[in-house]
Amino acid sequence: GHHGSGNATDLTKQILADPRVASFIQEHSLSQDEIKRSLPKFNQFLVECRKVKEGDASYIAKGYEPILTMNEGYADVTYKETRQLKEQQEQQAIAKRINLVSLPQSYRKITFADIALDDVARVDTFESLVDFVANYPSPDQKGLYIYGDMGVGKSFMLAAMAHELSETKKVATTIIHYPSFTIDVKNGIKDGSVKEQIDAVKQAEVLVLDDIGAEQFSSWIRDDVLQVILQHRMIEELPTFFTSNYSFADLEAKLSNGRQGDETWQAKRVMERIRFLAKEVHLKGVNRR
């Protein structure tokens, strides 16, 4: 009856009075006919907008918001990513470029903003990392060999650098707990995966060898694993960082102490590569743990 059509007109008025709909009609100079054909879509648009606003569970397109677009002669509803979804996807993409091996996954979330600079000793190291990221890629990009006591935040700083590189330069960094890696490689002898494991590490875009010197000494690891990785990265000029409890001199002494007694030459050869790849930095400071 008459009553029903009255309601329909009211609804139409209500729809057309909505500022988002009104401005869309104006922007696309819709004719009366086009407006009429668009009414169901205008209605759908407003219903969906209301659901989004109220956080309605029946709203299907999570992370997308409804928008009006022009189709052939009538309006249509499409969905565009919301800022939150975009940000969420960006965060996931950033985290994906940080490859952690035998290290806590929480390292993915550390950023430069998380680094405590309460300590002058830390500022220089921090600034070197900031510069490295800002200038990446550059022809003379040397990594850092950061050494210092346990718990001063060496790995933490490099995890933050990896995050920054991923976010600002879309660069992938592999951070490896070196002592665990040496055990994995030794175990790889049984299943023939040694070469594969070494290749993955030596080809990483940016590499961090964490806690070098803490591994159980082995001439084979030194000469056929570490040396091979460093040699490749040196020739290909791939940025390489290290953390250690040992200075260059102490690491060299540790690497010389082989079964054959004096293996100074082999140790020197490895150290030459490390020196070529990275600048030695002593991170002093308070234990952060």
Give residue spans per PLM region:
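Short glycine-rich substrate-engagement loop in P-loop NTPases that contacts/grips substrate
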Residues: 120-129, 141, 147, 162-203, ...
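Dynamic helix-loop-helix/coil hinge segments at AAA+ ATPase domain boundaries and subdomain interfaces
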Residues: 98-125
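Loop/turn-to-beta-strand initiation segments
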Residues: 171-172, 203-206, 236-242
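Walker A/P-loop nucleotide-binding motif
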Residues: 137-159
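Interdomain "pre-motor" coupling segment immediately N-terminal to P-loop NTPase/helicase cores
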Residues: 47-103
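N-terminal nucleic-acid engagement/recognition segments and initiation subdomains in replication
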Residues: 1-63
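Walker B catalytic acidic pair
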Residues: 211-212
